Amino acid sequence: MKLTAFILPRCPYCLQMRELVEELRAERDELASVEIEFIDESAQPELADRYDYYRVPSFFLGTEKLYEASPLWTRAEAKHRLGAMFDAVLEKE
């Protein structure tokens, strides 16, 4: 299963998300089967424009949005929501 994630290189939420994804992968072996393609929206704006999102990081499975970060979330909330996103992806396998 392959996810597409839109990011910005200096975005603090994107940096945090990468750390959280690595934490989740270390905790859950089954996440090794989920591939993530990270796309810098500033480097590929034409591709980013094809997807419906407002904030980064945002994750998609095909064109279905599975996750869009919020600046209001704590680190724990973001990790919980990323975990729920991975659960949803694994159910589709």
State where each predicted segment sits.
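A hydrophobic alpha-helix adjacent to the NAD(P)-binding/active-site core of NAD(P)-dependent oxidoreductases
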Residues: 48
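Secondary-structure boundary motif
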Residues: 26-30, 91
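Thiol-based oxidoreductase modules, predominantly thioredoxin-like and allied folds used
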Residues: 31-45
